[in-house]
């Protein structure tokens, strides 16, 4: 059995790490490189960096900090933000990133997933899915351009359908960003994760809602996700990564202990 992964997420805007609640009202957390170094030292299995306004601004992720991060950490990291071409991806990977993640650009051009997978291999290609539960319809819908609340829009895709589509096109991993839960720290949306797990045959990463160590355990035990991504509980030092992993190990979760 592969070890489960603990993945701090660093949302980047204007060269700094920020964090919002339900993808709104972002506050500045700090500088990118020191945070990345801290999480690596605490025992994170990998890091994810989202340049949250790149796609809505029509630009690619700011590459200047990617190489600086690569110099100070020795764990894998993934970069996302406005990657719309093979050239964009090649540059980011050449600066030291291990994976690239696409979200809004994949919705705009689904063939991008296949072209990237064919060029760089599926192991490098992560598809992020921003999913919102509509209480009126009882359905989960994929959203686009969520880094800028003035441009965020609901797409025609229901979440489960898009999960299946991106796998057909070559996604090697899926990060499910559950917008309703984001930043509120009351637990992952286990019901949604279970539904996605049934149709997801590549590694699945849960994102949005972690507030306690038990929330991580529930995601691994009840929804069988491969990794759990979180931000605010790590940024605000509510949970220490090393202590979290020790707790998960005592609960029978296969996890890499530092």
Swiss-Prot record:
Alphabetical list of HAMAP family matching this protein: HisF
The organism's place on the tree of life at top rank: Bacteria
Short name of any one Pfam family annotated for the protein: His_biosynth
GO molecular function ontology, one term from the record: imidazoleglycerol-phosphate synthase activity
Gene: hisF
Protein name (Swiss-Prot/TrEMBL): Imidazole glycerol phosphate synthase subunit HisF
Native organism taxonomy: Bacteria, Pseudomonadati, Pseudomonadota, Gammaproteobacteria, Enterobacterales
Reaction(s) catalysed by this chain's protein: 5-[(5-phospho-1-deoxy-D-ribulos-1-ylimino)methylamino]-1-(5-phospho-beta-D-ribosyl)imidazole-4-carboxamide + L-glutamine = D-erythro-1-(imidazol-4-yl)glycerol 3-phosphate + 5-amino-1-(5-phospho-beta-D-ribosyl)imidazole-4-carboxamide + L-glutamate + H(+)
Known EC number: 4.3.2.10
Function recorded in the entry: IGPS catalyzes the conversion of PRFAR and glutamine to IGP, AICAR and glutamate. The HisF subunit catalyzes the cyclization activity that produces IGP and AICAR from PRFAR using the ammonia provided by the HisH subunit.
